[in-house]
């Protein structure tokens, strides 16, 4: 259990998708203007990561990696070159299902997220979760914990940035830095804060 807690904490703070690896910056900046919308997208990312990382782990373990098809009598077959296509397919399917559910049950959030909800499919933070899982050779349980942690890390970062940006609306920001200028500086300062976790050994 301690191993899984360490993996979760490491995924959230030490290896934060947005503030340590700078992944998913497009949606991270565009949707972080309001806290409610940012939290909604953050929850969507958590759900997608929690499902896709372990699902892609199963696909890689039992279908794609070298020797994975031994159960089917094909021990020499290596389909790992199909990894990227498979992961994108799984992510696209999960995002499509999530999009339909939000449209039906939470239309206000669906409309607020707009084009950025289907763009989760090509959000590099989502793909990175599956690629890191393969690179680090996680098992199914580790993949599930890592999926939750990596999704939560991105959600935490976007919610924090949205809160800061809402406060900045009422701040006296120099004219040349208003808008994206102060946002980039804020992200950099947040990233410096998260860098303090980089020396933590878990």
From Swiss-Prot:
Domain of life according to the entry: Bacteria
Transmembrane regions listed in the UniProt entry: 11-31, 35-55, 81-101, 114-134, 144-164, 180-200
Any one GO biological process: sodium ion transport
Main location: membrane
GO molecular function, a single term: oxidoreductase activity, acting on NAD(P)H, quinone or similar compound as acceptor
Membrane topology: Multi-pass membrane protein
Family: Belongs to the NqrDE/RnfAE family.
Lineage, top ranks: Bacteria, Pseudomonadati, Pseudomonadota, Gammaproteobacteria, Pseudomonadales
Keyword list, A-Z: Cell inner membrane, Cell membrane, Ion transport, Membrane, NAD, Sodium, Sodium transport, Translocase, Transmembrane, Transmembrane helix, Transport, Ubiquinone
InterPro entries reported in the protein's UniProt record: NqrDE/RnfAE, NqrDE/RnfAE_oxidrdctase, NqrE
Keyword Nucleus: no
Annotated function: NQR complex catalyzes the reduction of ubiquinone-1 to ubiquinol by two successive reactions, coupled with the transport of Na(+) ions from the cytoplasm to the periplasm. NqrA to NqrE are probably involved in the second step, the conversion of ubisemiquinone to ubiquinol.
Name of the molecule in the record: Na(+)-translocating NADH-quinone reductase subunit E
Subunit architecture: Composed of six subunits; NqrA, NqrB, NqrC, NqrD, NqrE and NqrF.
Enzyme category, top tier: translocase
Catalytic activity, EC: 7.2.1.1
One GO cellular component term: plasma membrane
Protein's organism: Pseudomonas aeruginosa (strain ATCC 15692 / DSM 22644 / CIP 104116 / JCM 14847 / LMG 12228 / 1C / PRS 101 / PAO1)
Localisation: Cell inner membrane
Coiled-coil segments: none
One of the Pfam families matching this protein, by short name: Rnf-Nqr
């Amino acid at each position: 259990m301690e191993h899984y807690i360490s993996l979760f904490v490491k995924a959230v703070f030490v290896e934060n998708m947005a503030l340590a690896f700078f992944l998913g910056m497009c949606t991270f900046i565009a949707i972080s203007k309001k806290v409610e919308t940012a939290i909604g997208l953050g929850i969507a990312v958590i759900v997608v990561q929690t499902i896709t990382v372990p699902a892609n782990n199963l696909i890689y373990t039992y279908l794609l990696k070298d020797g994975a098809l031994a159960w089917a009598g094909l021990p020499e077959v290596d389909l790992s070159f199909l990894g990227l296509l498979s992961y994108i397919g799984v992510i696209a399917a999960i995002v499509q299902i999530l999009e339909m559910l939000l449209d039906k049950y939470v239309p206000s959030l669906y409309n607020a997220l707009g084009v950025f909800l289907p763009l989760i499919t090509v959000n590099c933070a989502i793909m990175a979760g599956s690629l890191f899982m393969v690179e680090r050779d996680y098992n199914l349980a580790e993949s599930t914990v890592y999926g939750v942690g990596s999704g939560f890390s991105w959600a935490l970062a976007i919610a924090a940035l949205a809160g800061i940006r809402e406060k900045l609306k009422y701040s006296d920001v120099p004219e040349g830095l208003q808008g994206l200028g102060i946002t980039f500086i804020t992200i950099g300062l947040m990233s410096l804060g998260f860098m303090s976790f980089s020396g933590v050994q878990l």
